[in-house]
Amino acid sequence: MECAGDSWDANADHDVLLDPVLLRRSAKMYLNGVDPHTPLASPLYADLRGLPPLFIQAGTREILLSDSTRLAHSAHDAGVDVTLDLWDGMVHGWHYAVSLLPEARAAIENIREFISFHTTQEK
């Protein structure tokens, strides 16, 4: 919600799905004057202890990459079993191109494997 991080600037010209200006405007409207550091507005500032296993995927070319890595580190520090699955060269929402990109199909397969592993009775 604070719309900050290295990837906001570094990937602004690469991420074709997310517009930093529009996202900042949307965050401001959503927050309606509330501090963006409020845990209910952003999990980056929440107490993550006790969360179930967490799977985070991000593309290295998306503007939300910094948020994704920060969330993964915070979750890890809180004792959460977290998997950060980074995809080189991908922008936000590359999964939508499942019929075009082998990376999208592979990413979705990683999601399936994570869910299957964590929902199987015997591990």
Language-model-detected regions and their locations in the chain:
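Alpha/beta-hydrolase superfamily serine-hydrolase fold, recognizing
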Residues: M1-K123
